[in-house]
Amino acid sequence: MKSKEQSSTAKGVFISFEGPECAGKTTQIRMLQEYFAQRNINTVVTREPGGTVIGEELRMIVKHHVGETAVVDEAEVLLFAASRAQHVHKLIIPALSSGINVICDRYSDSTMAYQGYGRGLDLSFIETLNRFATAGCMPDLTFVLDLTAEESSERIINREETLFLEDRIESAELSFHKKVRQGFLEIARCEPQRVKIISAVQPKEVIHGQIIGLLENVIK
């Protein structure tokens, strides 16, 4: 991992965080951002869907339109891909090309897990769609913070923050979230070098330590 002074001529490192709802991604992203900042490592934090003006507008449509205005599954996967394409070309690739590290809250693995395994859409189609939307730009390392669907549901119920808008994906049935979790586990099984499973039931400091250990072992 290179400092700000060293990174001007080097490609940045791309790190993504994945996992079910309320797995602690936001906390771990913040801790990793602080870790990099303390070492003068230039880093940008972003999210999907979102990360750009257009991406944030698509996020509102895909996550918070409920009832009769909710998007159908086929439209949902295409909207996620549209947000990602804009994100990749306008933010992620330019940052990495400038030697800036990118930490992304969700990326293409979420589309495979949620829309592929969760919704039951064609996996090969999603793989092709992801490849097109990302322009082949994939994370150097992906951390999946793993929780059972039951643990995730309990955290959602007990969390302190209140959502101003209903999140229709978060509020989906337990059976859906069980399929999503299996999707993440299968992705990690197929790509063990890139995708690392970390138990999200551990203390946040322990999880952070494991993340740093994996970063230091994989990214030089």
Spans of features found by a protein language model:
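NTP-dependent small-molecule kinase module
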Residues: 2-7, 33, 150-220
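Pre-Walker A (Motif I) flank of P-loop NTPase domains
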Residues: 10-14
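Walker A (P-loop) phosphate-binding loop of P-loop NTPases
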Residues: 22
